[in-house]
């Protein structure tokens, strides 16, 4: 039997957009997997619309809109989805289903869109705190929404989900420094660039790769406490959800390890995990879940960045 069109669209979106997460997503039970795919579809669509990688809307005129106008339309359609309006776009129909089913709040969705607003405004990040704030909007709040899909309502567990999103995004930033620079985006703290003898104007130059590698290493090291904190969140997830998240956590963390190990050559090719490595992590993840579920959960470290409440 073929999949329903909406699910088929969501499945293809995940396959095209995130090979790192696609493997882990297969581990969810069917109902949770459907909701995860639906949520991812909306996130991916919003990202593509802001970057003008897809028209995103039925009218050809939409492709000519300025980014600020595209962002405003995304906000309007997102709020309409919450209000129960009939959604013609598959991405918003998918989001409407998952948001209304799992109690995702308008604030969560709008917080995510605020991250795209930071890109539209070409926000510059001076401190690591500034970078973490961006990471919250584009990934930490996605962790919150994904956790709600998995049945999480405890604020302490949601904190751990947010931590994993922060860790994922810090890893993404380190991996994609040069690709982002090519489209005039820099998420690295200017203070860290200065510490390495770099500037926002010259950090991406090939002759500065050794110094840039030190900044990337610092970023990967900064992600580690958030990866560690997120481990405790597995304790309260349903078993198959915990298995999927533990796998995704291992895959993304390994990408950071590869970036760090490659040094100045980290951006000569896109750092990734092989199919064999993903399978090995998938098989090792149940052990992580068992440890998390049989270990007393300690309080979240006070020094970690705290999401807005």
From Swiss-Prot:
CDD domains: Trans_IPPS_HH. It holds the Pfam family SQS_PSY. ATP is required for the transferase activity but it does not seem to be hydrolyzed during the reaction. Its cofactor is ATP; Mn(2+); Mg(2+). Keywords: Carotenoid biosynthesis, Magnesium, Manganese, Metal-binding, Transferase. InterPro entries: Isoprenoid_synthase_dom_sf, Phytoene_synthase-rel, Squ/phyt_synthse, Squalene/phytoene_synthase_CS, Trans_IPPS_bact-type, Trans_IPPS_HH. Its EC number is 2.5.1.-. GO terms for molecular function: 15-cis-phytoene synthase activity; geranylgeranyl diphosphate synthase activity; metal ion binding; squalene synthase [NAD(P)H] activity. PANTHER family: BIFUNCTIONAL LYCOPENE CYCLASE/PHYTOENE SYNTHASE. Involved in the biosynthesis of carotenoids. Catalyzes the condensation of two molecules of geranylgeranyl diphosphate (GGPP) to give prephytoene diphosphate (PPPP) and the subsequent rearrangement of the cyclopropylcarbinyl intermediate to yield phytoene. This is Phytoene synthase. It comes from Pseudescherichia vulneris. The lineage of its organism: Bacteria, Pseudomonadati, Pseudomonadota, Gammaproteobacteria, Enterobacterales. The gene is crtB.
């Amino acid at each position: 039997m073929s999949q329903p069109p909406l699910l088929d669209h969501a499945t293809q979106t995940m396959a095209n957009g995130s090979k790192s997460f696609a493997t882990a997503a297969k581990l969810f039970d069917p109902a949770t997997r459907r909701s995860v795919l639906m949520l991812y579809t909306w996130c991916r669509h919003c990202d593509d619309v802001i970057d003008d990688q897809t028209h995103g809307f039925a009218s050809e005129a939409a492709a000519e809109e300025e980014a600020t106008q595209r962002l405003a339309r995304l906000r309007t359609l997102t709020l309409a989805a919450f209000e129960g309006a009939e959604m013609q776009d598959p991405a918003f129909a998918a989001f409407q289903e998952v948001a209304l089913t799992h109690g995702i709040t308008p604030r969560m969705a709008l917080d995510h869109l605020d991250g795209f607003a930071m890109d539209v405004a070409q926000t510059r990040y001076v401190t690591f705190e500034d970078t973490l704030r961006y990471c919250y909007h584009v990934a930490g709040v996605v962790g919150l929404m994904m956790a709600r899909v998995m049945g999480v309502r405890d604020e302490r567990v949601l904190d751990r989900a947010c931590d994993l999103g922060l860790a994922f995004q810090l890893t993404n930033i380190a991996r994609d420094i040069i690709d982002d620079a090519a489209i005039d985006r820099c998420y690295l703290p200017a203070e860290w660039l200065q510490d390495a003898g770099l500037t926002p104007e010259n950090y991406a130059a090939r002759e500065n790769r050794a110094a840039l590698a030190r900044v990337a290493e610092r970023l990967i090291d900064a992600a580690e406490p958030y990866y560690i904190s997120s481990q405790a969140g597995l304790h309260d997830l349903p078993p198959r959800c915990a298995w999927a998240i533990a796998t995704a956590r291992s895959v993304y963390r390994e990408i950071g390890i590869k970036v760090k190990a490659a040094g100045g050559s980290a951006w000569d090719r896109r750092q990734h995990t092989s199919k064999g490595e993903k399978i090995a992590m998938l098989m090792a993840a149940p052990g992580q879940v068992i440890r998390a579920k049989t270990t007393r959960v300690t309080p979240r470290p006070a020094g970690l960045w705290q999401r807005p409440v």
